[in-house]
Amino acid sequence: MADLDSPPKLSGVQQPSEGVGGGRCSEISAELIRSLTELQELEAVYERLCGEEKVVERELDALLEQQNTIESKMVTLHRMGPNLQLIEGDAKQLAGMITFTCNLAENVSSKVRQLDLAKNRLYQAIQRADDILDLKFCMDGVQTALRSEDYEQAAAHTHRYLCLDKSVIELSRQGKEGSMIDANLKLLQEAEQRLKAIVAEKFAIATKEGDLPQVERFFKIFPLLGLHEEGLRKFSEYLCKQVASKAEENLLMVLGTDMSDRRAAVIFADTLTLLFEGIARIVETHQPIVETYYGPGRLYTLIKYLQVECDRQVEKVVDKFIKQRDYHQQFRHVQNNLMRNSTTEKIEPRELDPILTEVTLMNARSELYLRFLKKRISSDFEVGDSMASEEVKQEHQKCLDKLLNNCLLSCTMQELIGLYVTMEEYFMRETVNKAVALDTYEKGQLTSSMVDDVFYIVKKCIGRALSSSSIDCLCAMINLATTELESDFRDVLCNKLRMGFPATTFQDIQRGVTSAVNIMHSSLQQGKFDTKGIESTDEAKMSFLVTLNNVEVCSENISTLKKTLESDCTKLFSQGIGGEQAQAKFDSCLSDLAAVSNKFRDLLQEGLTELNSTAIKPQVQPWINSFFSVSHNIEEEEFNDYEANDPWVQQFILNLEQQMAEFKASLSPVIYDSLTGLMTSLVAVELEKVVLKSTFNRLGGLQFDKELRSLIAYLTTVTTWTIRDKFARLSQMATILNLERVTEILDYWGPNSGPLTWRLTPAEVRQVLALRIDFRSEDIKRLRL
């Protein structure tokens, strides 16, 4: 008997899986059920069978739910049957058509290929026949032309022979007429060698005799014989001899030039110019011949040979220049002078002026010549490289850059310009120092002489560097000029401003009067009167004001110089001088120059602040403080009396007008306007302090409003600065002091303010309301602002 507390374990019977069916039979067989005798085992089997029954029922339900969908799909499939049969028939028909078309195309194309092959063979046969005929024609023509000394015609026949397809000739030699063709070839080769020897000999004779027509005649024959390089080399040698002969003639003429001659100062630049112009004429004259007879891309070879001779002649001219102008000695002298604590006697800058001008002129002519070569060679390469690969184009560009950048002409000019920059720096520094030392001021002028002199020198030096057509040279001079203006010259002006404007306070006036009385008393005892002390103060004032004008003009001059350089260099860059790197370098130099202009503006602002605090503030403060002496707690009678006899503002305006008149005559309009702006700001701040320490009644507030309006109206006429913005707080204070009652402020505050923007805080509004003696403090405190 099995244990009732534990489920029976039936051997060979597995637990049915939930939801697993799929049309399988029960795992419990009928034989197993019949063999069971225990009730508990029967119950266990029954439960399992019931579980399997539930699974089967769920599977049946799921299949029955899909019945409608499956039936509808079957109906659709039955309907598609006829259509699918039609499609099958059409597809078979289309496949047959495609197969037929493919076979037809294959047959046609094979026949076309056969036709093309036959056509090509026919052409080859015709070409072979033509070449054989040409070969015989060339042989007969060469012999006839040589006998009649018609070398051009002989060269043309030889060129035709050389252009024949060698493989065709080789095949012809294997045919029936091979022996005849061999004989013709041998005769042609002998004629070719004979013609080459004759052309070389005739060309040599023509060059020796200087017979240019004959030289050009045989020069044109070389490429017909396949001697492109030899022809260019021999012709270049002839041209180089001409260049050398003319250059030596020009140099001898230069060395014999009288120093009083008008062009004596630039004779070496003129010599180089003649050399470059001569080579340029040669290139222009013979470029069409080279392009026509030698083909595009060959001009580079001709110019390469010419440039070697040009370098030789440039070296001779520059050596004579260095020796006759004592260029290296002058440079060493300048270099010693530029060193600190140098005891060497300084060289006079005027002695360097003509040398520096000539060097820049020499470099400008060289740059122009090199740009000419670059343009000619580049255009020639472009024609020849129209169908070439990118590698070939890059290789040609490298050859061009190497020729122009590494030639002796470029290296020599770079060396001269390197020394020039140092000498130009010395010239600029010494002449600027001299201009500062000789600074003078003429009465009636706003600036002193050194400003115009210094900027004339700076413009001259930068302009001279610009005329060299070298961007590196120009950038170096701009940087040196920037340093000179920023450091040395600005320091001169800064030191003058640091001396300050002589104070004009009441105590200073008292001391001045006492000193003047003592000087007069002493002078009267000695029988003379010395005004040096008084004059020195006036001179110090004028010096300060003139320095301010100088600073302002310097800033403007630097900005103008920057714009001028931008315009001038735009023309240079448009001519192909420099590239993107040179443009970026130049822009950086101009940015540094513009920064110096801003530094001069900052210095001007410092000077104006000093003038305002020293000359204006000590005077304005007592005039504003006199506001305290005028009561603004007045009755109707006093208000009317103030109307007729203004107690304060008219005298204050008169004092301001008299004080500013002194500066108006001595300062530039821009500086005077800036100073007036500082003065108005000072008046607004100081008057606000005084008002907040005063008391008012209703009529007193009205009187203050009239005074403020008169003051604003006057200041508006003397400056272009916005006055009302500076006096906005005072105007709002006057509005508050004009109120009839405390709560009236709410008509102007918050949502009721309209376009008015309040500059006063709520605490400041209460503070101003408290200045009215007729307003109760309790009412002011109750305000909700």
Curated annotation (Swiss-Prot):
It is found in: Cytoplasm, Cytosol; Golgi apparatus membrane. The lineage of its organism: Eukaryota, Metazoa, Chordata, Craniata, Vertebrata. Gene3D superfamilies: 1.20.58.1970, ESAT-6-like. Pfam families: COG4_C, COG4_m, COG4_N. One of its GO terms (cellular component) is trans-Golgi network membrane. Residues 85-153 are annotated as: Interaction with STX5. Required for normal Golgi function. Plays a role in SNARE-pin assembly and Golgi-to-ER retrograde transport via its interaction with SCFD1. One of its GO terms (molecular function) is identical protein binding. It is a peripheral membrane protein. GO terms for biological process: glycosylation; Golgi organization; protein transport; retrograde transport, vesicle recycling within Golgi; retrograde vesicle-mediated transport, Golgi to endoplasmic reticulum. It comes from Homo sapiens (Human). Residues 618-740 are annotated as: D domain. Residues 2-84 are annotated as: Interaction with SCFD1. The modification N-acetylalanine is found at residue 2. InterPro entries: COG4 (IPR048682), COG4_C (IPR048684), COG4_M (IPR013167), COG4_N (IPR048680). Residues 741-785 are annotated as: E domain. Monomer. Component of the conserved oligomeric Golgi (COG) complex which is composed of eight different subunits and is required for normal Golgi morphology and localization. Mediates interaction of SCFD1 with the COG complex. Interacts with STX5. Belongs to the COG4 family. This is Conserved oligomeric Golgi complex subunit 4. The modification Phosphoserine is found at residue 6. It comes from the Eukaryota. It is linked to Congenital disorder of glycosylation 2J: A multisystem disorder caused by a defect in glycoprotein biosynthesis and characterized by under-glycosylated serum glycoproteins. Congenital disorders of glycosylation result in a wide variety of clinical features, such as defects in the nervous system development, psychomotor retardation, dysmorphic features, hypotonia, coagulation disorders, and immunodeficiency. The broad spectrum of features reflects the critical role of N-glycoproteins during embryonic development, differentiation, and maintenance of cell functions. Keywords: Acetylation, Congenital disorder of glycosylation, Cytoplasm, Disease variant, Dwarfism, Golgi apparatus, Membrane, Phosphoprotein, Protein transport, Transport. Residues 1-24 are annotated as: Disordered. Its main location: cytoplasm.
